[in-house]
Every structure is written in C-alpha cells, then in structure tokens.
C-alpha cells in the first residue's frame, strides 16, 4: 500500500515538475518576445525622429533661399524659425516619451506646428514664381517632399509596431509578465486631420 502511495506521490511530483517547466518555458518565451517587440518599438521610434530631424535640418537652407526673393515676408520667416526652434527642443529626449502622455503630446504638437508653419511658407512661395527657376530651391523642394513622405511612412510603421506590442502585453497571462518586469503600454500617433497624409510641397 505504501508502495502505491509512493508511486502516486512520485507521479504527482512529476506532474508538478512538468507543469513548472512548461510554465517557466512559457514565461521565458513571453518575456523574450516582449523584449523583442519593445526593441522594435524603440527602433521604429528612432526612425520617426530621424525623418523629423531631416526636415528640421532642411528648413534653414529653404528659408534662406526664399528670403532671396521675398525678404519682406518677415512674419512668415519668424513663424517658421520659432516653430523650428520648438520642434528642435523635442528631439533626443529618449524613448521614455512613449510612456509619458505629456511629453508625447508636446513632441506631436511641436512637429505639427512646424508643419503648419511650413505650409504657410508654401503659400508665400506661390507669390514668387521666379523661385521655380532657382536650382537650389528646386533641389530643396525635392528633398522636402521626399522627407514629408518618409515622415508619413515612418509614423505608420511606428504605429503598427506599437500597436502590436500593446496587444501582445495586454493579453492574459502575458500581462502578468509585462507588469512584473515593468513593460508598459506605448503611446502612438493618433489620427488627426492631415496626420496620415504628407503635406504637399509642390510649388
């Protein structure tokens, strides 16, 4: 009888061990997947920052070129310069911005303001058709148009990756693992008027 009890206990212990191994394996696999997705979000965010930085870097040359033909449009130039300065202050603030609603909103608003200022500059440029003969301006136009398109593409890619990460960590029982190791839901770009469409820069 004691032998049967011993065998029964051994079976129970074996089942517990097997269950424990499965549980640990699942936990390790889920943790590694969360880490992988988290790194993907960071990488996509870096690409978003890079294309916004590219636009930021193009603006001084664009403004100086336009000034050569429309030097009296000081109000517009000032608006672009100020918006650029504010946008520049939101770069390189680490990926912690993705967990901070205020910081993320500040970044998004600053970039949107700069985009709006550039659109007003485009309206001014329409008054000066002779600009279209300036080779430097034409080159900047092509670069800016390409950059605006890249911004739209990289924002969409980032949103897709962030949503995939969020869905993964919110499902049970992975949500327990995510909470244990401090993985939080990521913010992403919300749909706004013009947010998913690159501004037209055809002059």
Regions found by a protein language model. Give the residues of each.
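A helix-centric hydrophobic-segment signal that preferentially recognizes long
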Residues: 2-203
